[in-house]
Design a protein with these regions (language model features):
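Conserved ABC transporter NBD signature motif
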Residues: 65-73
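Conserved beta-strand-loop-alpha-helix hinge in the C-terminal portion
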Residues: 223-248
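Conserved ABC ATPase "signature" region
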Residues: 72-73, 110, 121-139
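Conserved catalytic motifs of ABC-family nucleotide-binding domains
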Residues: 165
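Conserved ABC ATPase signature
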Residues: 144-148, 152
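Catalytic Walker B motif of ABC-type/P-loop ATPase nucleotide-binding domains
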Residues: 169-172
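Short coil-to-helix segment of the ABC ATPase nucleotide-binding domain corresponding to the Q-loop/switch region
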Residues: 103-112
């Protein structure tokens, strides 16, 4: 059975102008992202990882080329239409979570979903289910962001990304600011939601985080120079880790 493509690019380019000089960050990129995959984007600094992530989600407009998301060419949408599409179909987890200090944990979680005009009662029910799933105790739901640990805040960020039932969760270095213990907890959550069918695209420079992915894409100079299929994550799978290390070595990482 053929894999279902959820995002596809055709000759995607992203160019920035700095001091009158054109910098070509993404170059004629043809890429397919498959539904249900935990896709990891790796590469050296400046390879275009985060730029690609933001382009795929429509957060940053492509300079040239096409991006088909759930069969729709989002490059043809106006900025307002792209924002509406993004709120409905995308969830985001960043290195810095940016929870709103004046809002409770529950209200922070609901904030993204309410922008999609879903019923608050339905969103609240879903939020409670996911908060429990990621082990955010009910006693924390009415508390405020400054009362959370770094790992708890990042898990709340993941719940916020999931509450509107997105097609894809986009994660940009989600464990970059966390210690080892909190990093493991966040990776466990991402792995768990992927096993339930959630499509994830994650940018990371960390081999431990990358090891949770089912498919690794390696970027170099704005184009894909290799990829590696790892399949679904299983704890303690040393062969999987060795395969990833060999692939990254081959890529010159």
């Amino acid at each position: 059975m053929a894999e279902e493509i959820i995002i596809r690019t055709e000759k995607l380019c992203k160019t920035f102008s700095t001091g009158g000089v054109q910098q070509h960050v993404i170059k004629n990129l043809d890429l397919e992202i498959y539904k249900g995959d935990f896709t990891v984007i790796m590469g050296s600094s400046g390879a275009g990882k985060s730029t690609l992530l933001y382009a795929l989600s429509g957060m940053d407009k492509a300079s040239l080329g096409r991006i088909y998301f759930c069969g729709r060419d989002i490059t043809k949408l106006s900025s307002d239409r792209q924002a509406i599409f993004r709120r409905k179909h995308c969830g985001f987890v960043f290195q810095q979570i940016h929870l709103i200090d004046s809002m409770s944990i529950m209200d922070n979680v609901l904030s993204a979903g309410l922008l999609t005009k879903q019923r608050r009662s339905e969103l609240t029910k879903r939020a409670k289910e996911i908060l429990k799933r990621v082990k955010i105790d009910e006693g924390l739901w009415k508390k405020f962001p400054n009362q959370l640990s770094g790992g708890e805040a990042q898990r709340v960020g993941i719940v916020r990304a999931l509450v509107n039932s997105p097609e894809v969760v986009f994660a940009d270095e989600p464990t970059g600011a966390l210690n080892s213990s909190n990093s493991d907890a966040v990776l466990d959550v991402l792995t768990d939601i992927n096993k339930s069918g959630q499509s994830i695209i994650m940018v990371t420079h960390d081999i431990k985080s990358a090891g949770r992915g089912s498919r690794i894409i390696y970027l170099k100079d704005g184009t894909v120079c290799g990829e590696c299929r790892l399949g679904q994550y299983t704890p303690g799978d040393t062969a999987r880790h060795d395969k990833l290390k060999a692939f990254l070595s081959e890529m010159g990482w």
